[in-house]
Amino acid sequence: MKVTPLAFESLGVRSQATLVETKDVRILIDPAVSLAPRRYGLPPHQLEVDKLTELAKKIYEISKDVDIIVITHYHYDHHDPGYVIPIEIYSNKMVFIKDPTNNINNSQKYRRAPKFLRALKDIPNKIEVADGKEFIFGSTKLIFSKAVPHGADERLGYVIQLGINDKDGTVLFTSDIEGAPKEQHLDFTKKISPNFIIIDGPLSYLLGRALSEEDLDKSIKNMESIVKNGLQYAIIDHHVLRDLNHENVLKPVKEVAKDFGVKVISAAEYLGVEPNLLEAHRRELFKKENKPARIPRGLAKLLHAGDN
């Protein structure tokens, strides 16, 4: 099994787009890219827009040779109804989606999911609601969790987690569980016993606003418990990498991981490149070059449609 992170915060954009290849199938998870509409009171910098354009093209090219596309929920850094990445990426694919009508918040149920499904009409070979189901392709098994909250409560909706198992082991893609602050986030991890996990981490950059100290502590303790249970790799990247203080936030997890021989890294480090935290450094980018970005029309529509 081969895991390739395609777009993450450590690669310069808001995303968790990932390619997983087994001898049976090529699976593209959450093919979307986005930017923070405002950060530190500032709009996206031109470097962020350029990086988004680059990674969107990369996802588009890779999509041509995949068999399966998975959408874990309907936030714009995890799905794209054609704003930035052409909807044609779904042509002739098998598409597994988060249930668009059950265990879902209102903005996704009544706006985002219906818009996405209308855009997909007649394009994929098949669309399958995946919540709580398993699918077998040769010696590869796709195991989907039931819907779990996007973080400590349901305000941001629900997501589905994905386990991919073959003879080499099991990869777990947690989607946006915000570092697993709830026990039900851990249930799926215990069920599938992954040796490789891709997890988003807590919303620590919003501590005191969208994240309480109590829930941050729960996330850290639960991530510590995850790395104690047979892991080899943990890519922790997405929400937590929007925080300039992410090293201190993740320090307890990394210390436990070291004791258990687990490698905890960002998507960029996994690929062998330097992390490029453009959003977290947006203030510094504008200090170096203080001019607003030229926003392409599709990206403008995406940013206008709401934050992630």
UniProtKB/Swiss-Prot annotation:
Listed InterPro entries: Metallo-B-lactamas, RibonucZ/Hydroxyglut_hydro, UPF0173_UPF0282_UlaG_hydrolase, UPF0282_hydrls
Highest taxon listed in the record's lineage: Archaea
Native source organism of the sequence: Sulfurisphaera tokodaii (strain DSM 16993 / JCM 10545 / NBRC 100140 / 7) (Sulfolobus tokodaii)
Name of the protein this chain belongs to: UPF0282 protein STK_23220
Similarity remark: Belongs to the UPF0282 family.
